[in-house]
Amino acid sequence: MTQARCIRLRSPLWPKRPFNEAYKKLGMLGTGEQKYMPWMQATYLMAANKQALQYLPAGTDLNTITYDQLIEWSKNIAEKTGSPKFGFPAGPKGLKHRFFEGFLYPSYTGSMVTKFRSAEAETAWNKFKELWQYTNPNSTNYAFMQEPLLSGEVWVAFDHVARLADAFNKKPDDFVAFPAPAGPAGRGFMPVVAGVAIPKTSPDMDKAKALVAYMLKPETQIATLKATNFFPVLDVKLPDDMPASVKAFGPAIATMTAAPDARPALLPMGLGDLGGKFNQVYTDSFERIVLGGEDVHGVLGEEAAALKAIIDQSKAPCWAPDKPSAGACPVD
């Protein structure tokens, strides 16, 4: 459904309480009007064993951590314990491509597509190569980071909340959750946002608006969280009977998404059945640069050509964090 076919949603439809402004802006769909209202969210987070906290670099706040601080922290842990304990889901079924698309690239380039082979992108990959020195080598087998966290193989990890939850539910006193790191361009993160819009052809506009207002009530958002593990986009107080993972993730998600340097990156869109090939470009870049040790500049030049071919074939316009485009999203 295009934005031209949806009515403008106005403020009386949602409660007068803090609302995620970054998501509201995304819901304008490139227009000056609220066409789509974010409703619930899931995302990816960082998790750490509390044993790792003693090795944090001086002055580091987990809620505002940067990639440089994460690298220094991981180095400290490796040197003090004698083994690398950062963990990354780089296995065949891991969600590594989402990290590069939605976290690393936006944090260093402010882009996912257009600046794929930029100087800033080269910096991003070189920073990740630094981090990889202190990453558990078994990471190339990991899919769900909750497992190596529980076993103690890994002390600090990145993954989707659904793939971290078991660790927090089984050993709630052992772990902390915190936002993804920030880079020079902001705190890139990839939300999975469910939302609502009202088409102009709705047969009963009043009932449609009433449904939107109901779905955005705090109590409705809490009920949805219990049923689906998708988190509210409103600032709501969670009840005491929630699972340990929800209690840990809720504040971390709220902090990350409302951060002043937040840079949300949407899931790739408009690619049709080429989505898998799009993801493969980021996976191939990781395998060639980080695992294979190939030249960063050369790899990005070659992979950018593959990325451009996919975008041109699908004619997909840009999505956040890239600026809207009239035609296929450019790859500079």
Enumerate the language-model features and the residues they cover:
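Extracytoplasmic "Venus flytrap"/periplasmic binding protein-like
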Residues: M1-A22, Q54-P57, W155-V156, D166, ...
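Hinge/lid segment of periplasmic solute-binding proteins
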Residues: M1-T43, Q69-I71, V176-F178
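Extracytoplasmic/periplasmic solute-binding protein
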Residues: G30-Y44, D68-T114, E120, V154-W155
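Short helix-initiation/N-cap motifs at beta->coil->alpha
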Residues: I65-Q69, N138-L150
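Glycine-centered hinge/linker elements that transmit conformational signals in sensory
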Residues: E72-I77, V113-N141, A180
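Extracytoplasmic/periplasmic substrate-recognition and gating elements
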Residues: K129-N136, N169-P232, L266, D284
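Paired acidic/hydrophobic, glycine-rich loop segments that form the ligand-binding mouth/hinge
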Residues: W155-H160, V176
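Long, aromatic- and glycine/proline-rich binding clefts that accommodate carbohydrate-like moieties
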Residues: A227-R288, A316-D332
